[in-house]
Amino acid sequence: TIFREYPYLYQGSLSDEEKYLSNYTEAPDSLIILALDESGQAIGASTCLPLTRAHPEFQAPFHSHGLDPAEYCYFGESVLLPPWRGRGLGGQFFDFREAHARSLPGVRFATFCAVDRPTDHPLRPETYRSPEPLWHRRHYQRQPHLTAEFSWQEVNQPSDTPHQLTFWVKPL
């Protein structure tokens, strides 16, 4: 549901998601956070794992710039249902993932990537709030030279299309 929203506009299948998430469920040094409401309903999730265990598409820009992926913890998803946004849970997701990253031997940086979309994208809602202010407050810096290409099927599209994602990095 959340990834169907702008900016990802993802329309994948459950099997695609299971395959993607298997990296996290099979890695002993990954972290999967599930946020639940008072009734036990899932309201959000967040993930991280050493960059060396992430998909090769995410490691490639680091290799091509002479950076050692072993020094990075890759922060994957961080999603919350709309009623739960703006309550500090996103910051808590970062707190937990940064603490986990610091516990991993040799990891010196936290990193994640975000899809690049033009500000005038036709599917951008008027009410869209960019998470970039949160990322800046947490001292993440956009790294325009570190980009990855990852393909997925967008809503109302017949097949997968490539998307550029730019990495953000923070020293730990």
PLM regions and their residue ranges:
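A short, well-structured alpha-helix characteristic of acyl/acetyltransferase catalytic modules
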Residues: T1-E5
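Active-site rim helix/loop that mediates acceptor-substrate recognition in acyltransferases
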Residues: P7-E38, A42, T47
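Short beta-strand micro-motifs in enzyme catalytic cores
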Residues: L31-I33, E71, P162-W168
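Conserved acyl-donor/pantetheine-binding loop and adjacent beta-alpha core of acyl/acetyltransferases
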Residues: A45-E77, P122-L123, Y128, L146-D160
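Polar/charged side chains located within well-ordered beta-strands of beta-rich proteins
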Residues: S46, F94-R97, W135, K170
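Conserved GNAT acetyl-CoA-binding A-motif
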Residues: F75, F94, A101-T127
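Conserved acetyl-CoA-binding loop-helix of GNAT-fold acetyltransferases
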Residues: L80, G86-R102
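C-terminal "cap" of GNAT-fold acetyltransferases
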Residues: T127-P133, R138-Q141, A148-L172
